[in-house]
UniProtKB/Swiss-Prot annotation:
Name of the protein this chain belongs to: Glutamine synthetase
Domain GS catalytic: 99-439
Subunit-level organization: Oligomer of 12 subunits arranged in the form of two hexagons.
Coiled-coil annotated residue ranges, if any: none
UniProt similarity note: Belongs to the glutamine synthetase family.
Organism the protein comes from: Pyrococcus abyssi (strain GE5 / Orsay)
Amino acid sequence: MNVSEVKSGATRSPKFVQLIFVDINGMPKGMEIPASRLQEAIEDGISFDGSSVPGFQGIEDSDLIFKADPDTYVEVPWDNVARVYGYIYKDGKPYGADPRGVLKRVIEKLAEMGIKAYIGPEPEFYLFKKNGSWELEIPDVGGYFDILTLDKAKDIKREIAEYMPSFGLVPEVLHHEVGKAQHEIDFRYDEALKTADNIISFKYIVKAVAEVHGLYATFMPKPIYGMPGNGMHLHISLWKEGENIFKGEEGLSETALHFIGGLLKHAKALTAITNPTVNSYKRLVPGYEAPVYISWGYKNRSALIRVPAFWGNGARIEYRCPDPSANPYFAFAAILMAGLDGIKHKVEPFAYVEENVYEMDEGKRKELGIDTLPGSLGEALDELEKDKVVREALGEAYKNFIEYKRKEWESYLEYLEAKHLPKDTKRVTEWELERYFFI
């Protein structure tokens, strides 16, 4: 594909292009090139030093190449610059630790089976005033679905939604969330790789618009103790030959039920990837509609997996534990491979619940076979190390991921010890704010 084809739908002629990829944490990284080098970036790639990118290479062997994916070209409406995602190469071959490449390989496995995965995310975020400290100021007092005077950020949300189509995102619903200054803008589902790209773009738009209004936007899972956390529920369906194969005659198909079985089977290990930060586990506590118990049910928001009340081609499942700190490429790859394992081995879903699982006593949960998700990043990493299917979903990136996250956990424990804080504290620490606030 040449540059003229890439820009066929463009309305302006930016002088620079941002080459965007993500590190092991899902944080966007990149570089700018003159627009005149875009064709080179597509065909030959642009070299860069991978040693300073978290979770990539050491300084002794750090040369990497970024090749632009021309299908992702967009122009930033408020700046004289375009953006493009791409893939990382090393020594002429796809780089194993490239998160986007990890998801691409999983999608190719699905394609061999004639399957496409569609995912719709619900990323939540807070808007805070800037005050030069970690004493976070809340700019509004609205609550869930509040409108008009109580939602002080309604104009900001509208502005975000107006910019989204320029990046290929279709906004669907804008609303205030449960927490004061907490918000959600849902955008239309798409194929898994496009949705992962869209999540990165969405965060970029939200933060840029907030900045203009003198605010900080954070997707940190639990920025304030005692307030609801930020989740990122994922709506998932699989399609084959234009048909939703999660669709059954009455409700879900056997394929969908086995996919649920796979997610339940691998849920503990998956959590290390869908909830990959110390702070993630301060959201996953009872009382805030964040799932804690490994269970599933129809229309039941207390379960880990909810089946929404949509049938026919709208049939899907909602995986409720992920949060916006997840690297979406890793998270989607792991979830899809866990679900496929369930389909392959015909894993029947277990721990079905119709009532509020939080209100059950321990005996009832035990009777229904309901287990709990890991209670900390350390516990989640232990589960990941034991789960071959989820490990292999990350491919060569697994080694980098587990090493990086083990160091992160150890650093947090050292901080707690130095501050004489209990290991199981659910308070949000300054260590977390410094590390995760700008996720």
